Amino acid sequence: MSILINKDTRVITQGITGKTGQFHTRMCVAYANGKNCFVAGVNPKKAGEDFEGIPIYASVKDAKAQTGASVSVIYVPPPGAAAAIWEAVEADLDLAICITEGIPIRDMLEVRNKMKAKEAAGGKKTLLLGPNCPGTITPEEIKIGIMPGHIHKKGRVGVVSRSGTLTYEAVAQLSELGIGQSSAVGIGGDPINGLKHIDVMRLFNDDPDTDAVIMIGEIGGPDEAEAARWCKANMKKPVVGFIAGVTAPPGKRMGHAGALISGGADTAEAKLAVMEECGFIVTRNPSEMGRLLKKAIGI
């Protein structure tokens, strides 16, 4: 098993005809079961055409009706990306994964409010991963997004992170130690995003094929502390935690739009302290994540 996606997932690529969409669709199709998983693309101006055998439809709704796809991945440029997310939500997909970085905050606020209103009115809930995220992978089954597939190995450790490159770092360390991953999830570094650490930790906790988790956060926002407190009360599996930005000065944005210390609780040290209090195995050195996880699961 896995969380969010598996070899039976069927995927629509929104933005399949752009350079980025084409490149990463190619990479995803070439990985594991990708040839069967990526079944449609969307571009209203190119409906009826195809990209390397993948049919292109005018809308997500059409693509879903024709292929039965339940997940979309979005490579649409920032000005149109929020509208692309909403199109996936309106089509009642299970999951929309938005890779795009630099979506205006106002656009994301609008989409989030519309998603909440739809849910409150009894409409289907579509999970959103991202924006500004690397996507998610279930090793040796399917990858949706921009992560390098070859570093992953199938196994029983979950990885969740706000940072794409730190996800890859944790995964590479685990694989080098001979420890495989059940799923790796990049939730993205924007201040307004979909799934949070707490949501992914819940999924890993409930997944019978995940034995332990590496949770990676960064400065800014309350997400990691909220997830740690939830884990203290509910998590049945060992968690290794790392927070990037120990040396970050207050008020300076560090890479991601959401990586900004605006109060004492937003600092790396404050978050690490909460994680330690909540029973996490914490490291201040990212090169130790894999080794600590190995120790935690007793191999």
What are the residue ranges of the model-derived segments?
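Catalytic-core regions of core metabolic enzymes
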Residues: 1-299
